[in-house]
Amino acid sequence: MKNYETVIGLEVHVELATKTKIFCACSTAFGGAPNTHTCPVCTGQPGSLPVLNKQVVEYAVAVGLATNCTITQYSKFDRKNYFYPDNPQNYQISQLYLPICRNGSVEIETANGKKNVRIHEIHMEEDAGKLVHDEWEDVSIVDYNRSGVPLIEIVSEPDMRSAEEVIAYLETLRQTIQYLGASDCKLNEGSMRADVNISVREVGAKKFGTRTEMKNLNSFKAIAHAIEGERERQIELLEMGRKVVQETRRWDDNKESSHAMRSKEDAQDYRYFPEPDLVPIVVSDEWIAQIKAKQPELRPQKLARYKKEYDIPEYDAKILTESKHMADIFEAATKLCGKPKKVSNWLMVETMRLLKDNDMDADAIKFSPVNLAKLVDLVDAGTINSSVAKEVFEKIFREDIDPEQYVEENGLKSMNDEGELKVTIQAVIDANPQAVEDYHNGKKKAIGALVGQTMKATKGKANPAVVNKLLMELL
């Protein structure tokens, strides 16, 4: 079999975090009752006219600046004409000829090192409604709440060569956009969606192969599986002497396979023409400067600051800053208790373990920095020991309980009175003569059994190090 190279480009749609839609005052809130966040504008009623939401432009420019794009200072909207039930106007207001941002790049890092992925353009557009096919066999229903929600579409050049590079690119984009506050980028809620354009060609060939577009990719895992599946399908066709058809394919995560949806359209198929109801967008130097001045600290700068300000290893700083949400928790808890390394340890070890056990990502963390800081202080003061602290943290992780109140109500404070502890230890010694004899006969491991029995007798409230010290004294 010949050696093949995979060529991948992405179209990433990101719902912007505005309170209202791109061309009307309807709410963009996720999860409302069907068709309650609608009006004549976003449902395409005759006579209704769009008015551009200024915040959409500012978010688009902010993302463009953060991805090294050139900002188009004279930009226009265009009509993309197509007929589909989720599109009540029978056209979408988008940008083809003069998109808001062009010629950017993002740096990604994989096991093979660092690489720049070029961004062809970023354009603004409105989202479509949502079709639901599962209620009845012969009827589809549509919810127009999403119709008119503002999007930016980030179109990459075909610079990626593997699923690993694609995931690294998407993670970098998501982190950047979340840090900007431009979107929450939740794939499971559809606020970040990626269409994957993929082709294969013989290694060394200059000409691109025929591409297909993969849709219905709702997680990074699905994206990786779809890329591998489509790569294998195209190679199999070429090895059989058949042609790859330019088409849009729908990925089925349950079946781990895809099926053809429609032939892949080109721009001319949509009969684009300038949007007559919206004036051009003029982005002045002053406006760009204002947007740039408001930009928050992005991940690369935060990572460098953590290493310097908190003396945290680079690996830990990378984990803490992967999610803006986790970074915010870390900084807030550190500000409250003043112990960055101890806060970092709770996030790096116990939090990551519980996230993995519950198949969650860091953006799903519900506990408050206040309660994490209180837990750090309780351990630091010796009020509770490390084993009790882990029990308390699990409650914080799941229910965001107040650790001080929980420790008090459940009698979990450490036994810090050595006199009281000696009485308990002596009782353990008296009840375990064989372990005592083994210890005196040189079997040093026997002390561990006595420590364990003491911890059991104190219901885990004693400090194991103190127990060990007192046992040595009494023996």
Swiss-Prot record:
InterPro entries in the cross-refs: Asn/Gln-tRNA_amidoTrfase_suB/E (IPR017959), Asn/Gln-tRNA_Trfase_suB/E_cat (IPR006075), Asn/Gln_amidotransferase (IPR018027), Asn/Gln_tRNA_amidoTrase-B-like (IPR003789), GatB (IPR004413), GatB_C_1 (IPR042114), GatB_Yqey_C_2 (IPR023168), Gln-tRNA_amidoTrfase_suB_CS (IPR017958)
Assigned protein family: Belongs to the GatB/GatE family. GatB subfamily.
Pfam family, one: GatB_Yqey
Listed PROSITE patterns: GATB
Function noted in UniProt: Allows the formation of correctly charged Asn-tRNA(Asn) or Gln-tRNA(Gln) through the transamidation of misacylated Asp-tRNA(Asn) or Glu-tRNA(Gln) in organisms which lack either or both of asparaginyl-tRNA or glutaminyl-tRNA synthetases. The reaction takes place in the presence of glutamine and ATP through an activated phospho-Asp-tRNA(Asn) or phospho-Glu-tRNA(Gln).
UniProt keyword terms in alphabetical order: ATP-binding, Ligase, Nucleotide-binding, Protein biosynthesis
Top-level taxonomic group: Bacteria
Reactions catalysed according to its record: L-glutamyl-tRNA(Gln) + L-glutamine + ATP + H2O = L-glutaminyl-tRNA(Gln) + L-glutamate + ADP + phosphate + H(+); L-aspartyl-tRNA(Asn) + L-glutamine + ATP + H2O = L-asparaginyl-tRNA(Asn) + L-glutamate + ADP + phosphate + 2 H(+)
Lineage: Bacteria, Bacillati, Bacillota, Clostridia, Lachnospirales
Subunit relationships: Heterotrimer of A, B and C subunits.
The keyword Ligase is assigned to this record: yes
Single GO MF descriptor: asparaginyl-tRNA synthase (glutamine-hydrolyzing) activity
The protein's Enzyme Commission number: 6.3.5.-
Matches recorded under HAMAP family: GatB
Any one Gene Ontology BP term: translation
Protein's recorded name: Aspartyl/glutamyl-tRNA(Asn/Gln) amidotransferase subunit B
